[in-house]
Amino acid sequence: MRPKTFPATTYSGNSRQRLQEIREGLKQPSKSSVQGLPAGPNSDTSLDAKVLGSKDATRQQQQMRATPKFGPYQKALREIRYSLLPFANESGTSAAAEVNRQMLQELVNAGCDQEMAGRALKQTGSRSIEAALEYISKMGYLDPRNEQIVRVIKQTSPGKGLMPTPVTRRPSFEGTGDSFASYHQLSGTPYEGPSFGADGPTALEEMPRPYVDYLFPGVGPHGPGHQHQHPPKGYGASVEAAGAHFPLQGAHYGRPHLLVPGEPLGYGVQRSPSFQSKTPPETGGYASLPTKGQGGPPGAGLAFPPPAAGLYVPHPHHKQAGPAAHQLHVLGSRSQVFASDSPPQSLLTPSRNSLNVDLYELGSTSVQQWPAATLARRDSLQKPGLEAPPRAHVAFRPDCPVPSRTNSFNSHQPRPGPPGKAEPSLPAPNTVTAVTAAHILHPVKSVRVLRPEPQTAVGPSHPAWVPAPAPAPAPAPAPAAEGLDAKEEHALALGGAGAFPLDVEYGGPDRRCPPPPYPKHLLLRSKSEQYDLDSLCAGMEQSLRAGPNEPEGGDKSRKSAKGDKGGKDKKQIQTSPVPVRKNSRDEEKRESRIKSYSPYAFKFFMEQHVENVIKTYQQKVNRRLQLEQEMAKAGLCEAEQEQMRKILYQKESNYNRLKRAKMDKSMFVKIKTLGIGAFGEVCLACKVDTHALYAMKTLRKKDVLNRNQVAHVKAERDILAEADNEWVVKLYYSFQDKDSLYFVMDYIPGGDMMSLLIRMEVFPEHLARFYIAELTLAIESVHKMGFIHRDIKPDNILIDLDGHIKLTDFGLCTGFRWTHNSKYYQKGSHVRQDSMEPSDLWDDVSNCRCGDRLKTLEQRARKQHQRCLAHSLVGTPNYIAPEVLLRKGYTQLCDWWSVGVILFEMLVGQPPFLAPTPTETQLKVINWENTLHIPAQVKLSPEARDLITKLCCSADHRLGRNGADDLKAHPFFSAIDFSSDIRKQPAPYVPTISHPMDTSNFDPVDEESPWNDASEGSTKAWDTLTSPNNKHPEHAFYEFTFRRFFDDNGYPFRCPKPSGAEASQAESSDLESSDLVDQTEGCQPVYV
């Protein structure tokens, strides 16, 4: 593929068509009119001027407007015919005989091809070298190997204005902004006579630029094996030194590369693989730049001659408003071609696309200073329409490597030189076309990135209160060595090459201060005392150099700044903001750090997690099976069944998403406290988003850990999560935070059985029969799930809106699972005592607060004291089976013992083993054979008396050994139909509820004292528990979080019944809605 270059003309055809057109025009010179043409040997000059002038006009017109396909070349051909008319009738033999051998030798020595030079002299009649050169330039298209050189010549045609005009000797063009003019009229004076040759080296300085290019042509494109023989030179070394040789290499056309001593072969700049040549760099890949006065013969063939004193100046981008687009000019020193003239401003404009680096001036010339636009801001000037100030160049270091230009077309092939010949320093054209690399999209590759070298950053602009200094005149030029020592060294990272310093002077109005914060002695004290920029920078540099050991002067200035109190109120230097971290963020970061847990904790967690995952999957399968069974019973059609399945799938998806949402107590608002227990409290709470009502039970972690209740809490969570029946309070959410555990459950507004016993004292036998029958079914459902409640008592039996019961508070429940065993939550060989076991705290009645209330009757006072013990921090052993207290091993029969004790209390009015202290109560329970007596004055039916004695007995003879059917078959329940759903039957007692948030059925609770006292008492135990020697188990509350699949927004009960006359009217509708709710409880997955 040909490289993308800039066409030298607007001609739309290809080069072959253009050559064919020129050949046809040259073969028919007689078609053009020849009248009025001057004859004579001196007519060539005028014709040439006319031709050149017309070419200039043609190129300018081509730039202004579009021309036909062959329009400009018709005019050019006509003018060529004018110049060839005097020789149209000459024969080739006669012309060949008249060839001037001296001119032929001079042209050959100048680098022209011998055949081309002979043909040119034949056609021009050996009149002058000027005419021969003109012919060679016109016939360059006929040589295909010089096609790209001709392309360069055409690009520098007069219409483009790319060639410099011959300049007069003046000191410098710097800052003038002049652009090179077009070609001037060619005069043959420099080529005639003895001034051309070794005796007249200055002729090249006054020679027009294009003809210097023609006299010193570069070698065209060659293959790897092609050898180009250079003709011998006929001029002296001084003329040779006047030009620089740029061999045009590569597969397309040549790219000059400058090499100086010390530069390694290959590319000195690290480039990405997409721009690197896959062929090895050739040894002679860079041209030699001979210097003036170089010793030795020209043909010495030095591989690395001393660098030329020249400037390698890139031109602006072709889109910029500049006359020279992508041209690279080699400007010699004062003794060489154009040496006396500095390049104009347009030449010194840097180019971004050519990716060139600047060479540096050599010789005895003075070091120029950097302009105001520094390197850091150089790219900001590379925009179309912007005139960049001239870039002065830094003194060149001969011992430092110079990076070459980066280009994707630098694929150099090794080209051996002529055998037996030393490589001469051949001149080359002064203009070279810069190739713009095409944008190639490469796949992303992992490229090793070199570590960047630290460089000095440019500080921010000085504060507004510091007056900008007036632009000072440029300082006197200093030698390169002094500049290197006086200025800061900037290390430029070059691949494999050592870093070399650059002399950079940040002068002019754009000088910048060091970055803030500034030292205290530089702070502004008052408006009258203004620091100029130089003093600020000097003071900052001094403070930075001083480091921790500051000089005495700095201490004095600091003391004076501190002592000046008036200056504190003045405006200070704005320093960089210092980030301030909040304590809360620090805590979050500390909490978010990954903690290291023991392998035992990991094992504990994984075993529970795997069990819960399997359980969750099984529940999902059961829900699908339940849906299919319900749809089969309902006889739904296939479309309806598919719709119900989609509804279930959507619910499953929502459930999985909601399970991942983190919950905290801020999602609930506490309304009122319902009760206080041993480890926490139960309160009525409202969910913020749905305004649903829940009963939220809060347990303090420190009390749970201190009382060794972790296993019990886990058991309660498991039973509430797995229980999905009407006899157990439904758990909706369970979550935890740093201090507490939370259970969010159904709110049962009817209160508990203990409150009803305190109010009614003694139940009628039919009411007791109803509650005991429902309690039997509730315990049976717990046993069927594989759990043992172990704490059945009136406080844990709740009465719902319709008067039916529900079990709650499974804190002492166990399912004979390993997670419900306390030993898995303890460390060491010391085992803590279970809370159900006898304790010295049972004799502590300091927590009893019944004495604070007025005692109207002795019996009522005893009842209230009993309630106080039930809600105390240690509980009461009144309802616990003796085998549990004796630690002899127990089964689910211990729950049936509790049923007999509750039946006794309902019918008699007090527990059978009531005692002043828990210890005495425990002793009575253990010696139940001697202490259990049914009062004679209490009139009980024989069935009730028999049931009590068969339940409160030894475990071997207790009812319930064969399950709940033993109790259902007892004569005491002859009036109860267990075959039908007892919850659908109307209850003998229905609590009075006025509104959904009515808590009148619960005992009033002092919301502060018991809780605060408990927290104060347990703080010491918590401190002891969390000490380094007795650290609490880290795996205590794994897998505690829970979310129920079907959330009915906290309204498991119907709307409260109206009071008074409206009750009878709404009773039938209430019963129907009750039946609907009860029917859907078993198949809730079906309904959304």
From Swiss-Prot:
Tissues showing expression: Expressed at high levels in heart and skeletal muscle and at lower levels in all other tissues examined.
Subcellular location: Cytoplasm, Cytoskeleton, Microtubule organizing center, Centrosome; Cytoplasm; Cytoplasm, Cytoskeleton, Spindle pole; Nucleus
Active site positions: D791 (proton acceptor)
Cofactor(s) in the UniProt record: Mg(2+)
Pfam families in UniProt: Pkinase (PF00069), Pkinase_C (PF00433)
Binding-site residues for ATP, renumbered to this chain: L674, G675, I676, G677, A678, F679, G680, E681, V682, K697
Annotated EC: 2.7.11.1
Full protein name: Serine/threonine-protein kinase LATS2
Annotated organism of origin: Homo sapiens (Human)
